[in-house]
Amino acid sequence: MIDKIKLIDSALEAQLKAICPYSNYPVGAALLSDDNNIIIGFNIESKAYPTTLCAERVAIFSALSQGYTNFIAMSVVTTDGATPCGSCRQIIAEYAGDIPIIISDSKKNFKETTTFKLFPHPFI
Protein backbone atom coordinates (compact mmCIF):
# COMPACT_ATOMS: atom_id res chain seq x y z
CA MET A 1 0.00 0.00 0.00
CA ILE A 2 1.23 3.47 -0.87
CA ASP A 3 1.61 5.90 2.04
CA LYS A 4 0.37 8.97 0.15
CA ILE A 5 1.03 11.42 2.97
CA LYS A 6 4.62 10.22 3.40
CA LEU A 7 5.17 10.59 -0.34
CA ILE A 8 3.64 14.09 -0.33
CA ASP A 9 5.74 15.05 2.71
CA SER A 10 8.88 13.89 0.91
CA ALA A 11 7.96 15.98 -2.13
CA LEU A 12 7.27 18.96 0.15
CA GLU A 13 10.75 18.59 1.68
CA ALA A 14 12.22 18.45 -1.81
CA GLN A 15 10.25 21.55 -2.82
CA LEU A 16 12.04 23.50 -0.09
CA LYS A 17 15.36 22.72 -1.81
CA ALA A 18 14.26 23.97 -5.24
CA ILE A 19 16.66 26.31 -7.02
CA CYS A 20 14.30 28.60 -8.90
CA PRO A 21 15.59 32.20 -8.85
CA TYR A 22 13.98 33.07 -12.20
CA SER A 23 10.47 31.66 -11.95
CA ASN A 24 10.16 31.67 -8.16
CA TYR A 25 8.06 28.54 -8.68
CA PRO A 26 9.43 25.74 -6.49
CA VAL A 27 8.51 22.17 -7.37
CA GLY A 28 9.29 19.00 -5.45
CA ALA A 29 8.88 15.39 -6.50
CA ALA A 30 9.13 12.10 -4.66
CA LEU A 31 9.42 8.78 -6.47
CA LEU A 32 8.65 5.52 -4.67
CA SER A 33 10.68 2.50 -5.75
CA ASP A 34 9.38 -1.06 -5.62
CA ASP A 35 11.56 -1.71 -2.55
CA ASN A 36 9.97 1.24 -0.67
CA ASN A 37 12.79 3.74 -1.09
CA ILE A 38 11.84 7.33 -1.79
CA ILE A 39 14.01 9.29 -4.20
CA ILE A 40 13.42 13.03 -4.33
CA GLY A 41 13.93 15.69 -6.95
CA PHE A 42 13.43 19.43 -7.16
CA ASN A 43 13.51 21.90 -10.01
CA ILE A 44 16.87 23.45 -10.83
CA GLU A 45 16.82 26.54 -13.02
CA SER A 46 19.53 28.00 -15.22
CA LYS A 47 19.95 31.41 -16.80
CA ALA A 48 19.86 29.48 -20.07
CA TYR A 49 16.24 28.57 -19.33
CA PRO A 50 15.88 25.63 -21.77
CA THR A 51 18.54 23.79 -19.76
CA THR A 52 16.42 24.01 -16.61
CA LEU A 53 15.43 20.65 -15.12
CA CYS A 54 12.03 19.89 -13.64
CA ALA A 55 11.65 18.15 -10.29
CA GLU A 56 10.04 15.05 -11.79
CA ARG A 57 12.91 14.44 -14.20
CA VAL A 58 15.52 15.12 -11.51
CA ALA A 59 13.84 12.49 -9.28
CA ILE A 60 13.70 9.89 -12.06
CA PHE A 61 17.22 10.53 -13.33
CA SER A 62 18.57 10.47 -9.78
CA ALA A 63 16.80 7.17 -9.12
CA LEU A 64 18.12 5.65 -12.33
CA SER A 65 21.66 6.82 -11.53
CA GLN A 66 21.38 5.05 -8.16
CA GLY A 67 20.34 1.78 -9.79
CA TYR A 68 16.60 1.91 -9.20
CA THR A 69 14.57 0.73 -12.18
CA ASN A 70 11.11 -0.18 -10.86
CA PHE A 71 8.75 2.43 -9.48
CA ILE A 72 5.29 2.22 -7.96
CA ALA A 73 4.20 5.84 -7.39
CA MET A 74 5.20 9.48 -7.60
CA SER A 75 4.15 12.64 -5.81
CA VAL A 76 4.58 16.12 -7.24
CA VAL A 77 4.14 19.26 -5.13
CA THR A 78 3.76 22.79 -6.47
CA THR A 79 2.45 25.91 -4.82
CA ASP A 80 -0.87 25.58 -6.64
CA GLY A 81 -1.11 21.87 -7.45
CA ALA A 82 -0.10 22.04 -11.12
CA THR A 83 0.45 18.87 -13.13
CA PRO A 84 3.75 17.79 -14.73
CA CYS A 85 4.80 19.35 -18.04
CA GLY A 86 4.81 17.36 -21.28
CA SER A 87 8.52 16.55 -21.11
CA CYS A 88 8.13 15.17 -17.61
CA ARG A 89 5.07 13.15 -18.63
CA GLN A 90 7.12 11.53 -21.39
CA ILE A 91 9.99 10.67 -19.02
CA ILE A 92 7.60 9.31 -16.37
CA ALA A 93 5.88 7.14 -18.99
CA GLU A 94 9.16 5.95 -20.46
CA TYR A 95 10.97 5.08 -17.23
CA ALA A 96 8.22 4.46 -14.66
CA GLY A 97 5.28 3.34 -16.76
CA ASP A 98 1.66 3.78 -15.77
CA ILE A 99 2.05 4.53 -12.07
CA PRO A 100 -0.17 6.46 -9.65
CA ILE A 101 0.77 10.14 -9.53
CA ILE A 102 -0.27 12.23 -6.56
CA ILE A 103 -0.50 15.93 -7.42
CA SER A 104 -0.49 18.24 -4.40
CA ASP A 105 -0.31 21.89 -3.55
CA SER A 106 1.87 23.18 -0.73
CA LYS A 107 -1.00 22.80 1.75
CA LYS A 108 -1.38 19.06 1.04
CA ASN A 109 -4.59 19.41 -0.96
CA PHE A 110 -4.09 16.59 -3.41
CA LYS A 111 -5.64 14.68 -6.27
CA GLU A 112 -4.65 11.32 -7.69
CA THR A 113 -4.20 10.34 -11.29
CA THR A 114 -2.00 8.00 -13.31
CA THR A 115 0.70 8.46 -15.90
CA PHE A 116 -1.48 7.36 -18.78
CA LYS A 117 -4.44 9.50 -17.68
CA LEU A 118 -2.14 12.51 -17.83
CA PHE A 119 -0.40 11.33 -20.98
CA PRO A 120 -2.47 8.72 -22.84
CA HIS A 121 -0.24 8.37 -25.91
CA PRO A 122 3.43 8.57 -24.89
CA PHE A 123 6.22 8.02 -27.37
CA ILE A 124 7.48 4.63 -26.13
Predicted regions and their residues:
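Short, basic/aromatic recognition patches
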Residues: 7-20
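Short beta-strand scaffold segments in enzyme catalytic cores
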Residues: 26-33
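Zn2+-dependent cytidine deaminase-like catalytic core
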Residues: 40-124
